[in-house]
Amino acid sequence: MQNRSLAPSITAEGRMSDKPDLPPPPHRPVAALQCYLAYLTSFVVGALTWWRLLESGTVEDPFWIGFIVTCVSTVAIWIFSIANDNSSIYDPYWVIAPPILALAFKATAGGGLLGDWSGRQVAVVACLWIWGIRYHTMYSWGGWRTGLVHEDWRYEEMRAAPVPYWLNSLLGMHLFPTVLVYFAFAPGILALVADPATQPPFGAWDALGVAGALTAVAIELFSDEQLRKFRETDAYHNGVAMRQGLWKYSRHPNYFGEVLFWLSMIPFAIPVGALAARPALVLAGPVAMAIFFRFSCWLMDVRSLARRPNYQQVVDEVSAMVPWVPKS
């Protein structure tokens, strides 16, 4: 999802959060209790929707069951966002949803959640939980602790769009990132719902997926920590661009880490035959995520060029996203 930018819910450094890059716009505060209630409601509504779809048999494909569920859960969050006039209530959803959905998908596969797990299923679920825990450990959302005292500045800008705010909030601030992350997760979903009894054991493709996902998490971890420390320096507050650590080789290494994580889901889909059977579904989401973040790099560069005097030199010398040797 990180990470993140293009999506109004992904911040300047690739994370959905309420980072103070700019002075927070005055908005209606949201109590922590409201944030907890929003996510409890979202979870209950999602679980009931999943159960109802399974019971009715109206949708048989687990992938599309999950898609409907995550969209319905997102709408539940959106209702709280509109009721509280603050769309930042949605901010952590895109990281919370995939690990929980992963367990739900395993429960629908052969053997259920408490039955036998294949090495592949363990790997996919473990990678998602490591990814999610890393994010929530480094970016403790204020909504859980003290509530929200402001709304993300991107949402503030989108309020000026020539469309009704409620519609812009629903489609652009809530459903768009939900759908993007869900389809990026598609290869992992197809690997999870495959019956372990009929699939090959953990192999080279799975090892590649694990290696890629863990490398991605490490890149995000180090780049975010390096940026956090830099934000505490006088250089940052004086408008100097970050050019240390991984940021020496990429203007947005955390974006690269997020893209790499979702691309790393693709190898898990290969041994179960999903890539051969449903290539568009396996590839479209991760590729769309890569395109999304690449365009996000451009948007953030435009903003940095207006705010940081030396940033044009960074653009000229440092790779936009993929780490590479600087030109000088």
What are these regions, as identified by a protein language model?
Residues 9-28:
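Short, Lys/Arg-rich, polar N-terminal cytosolic tail immediately upstream
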Residues 23-74, 98-141, 176-226, 231-328:
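Hydrophobic transmembrane alpha-helices
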Residues 75-84, 94, 102:
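Conserved donor-binding loop and adjoining core beta-sheet/short helix segment
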Residues 81-88, 114:
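Membrane-interface helix caps and helix-loop-helix hairpins in membrane proteins
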Residues 86-100, 148-172, 240-247, 320:
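Juxtamembrane helix-capping/reentrant segments at transmembrane boundaries
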Residues 135-155:
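Active-site neighborhood of divalent metal-dependent phosphoester bond hydrolases
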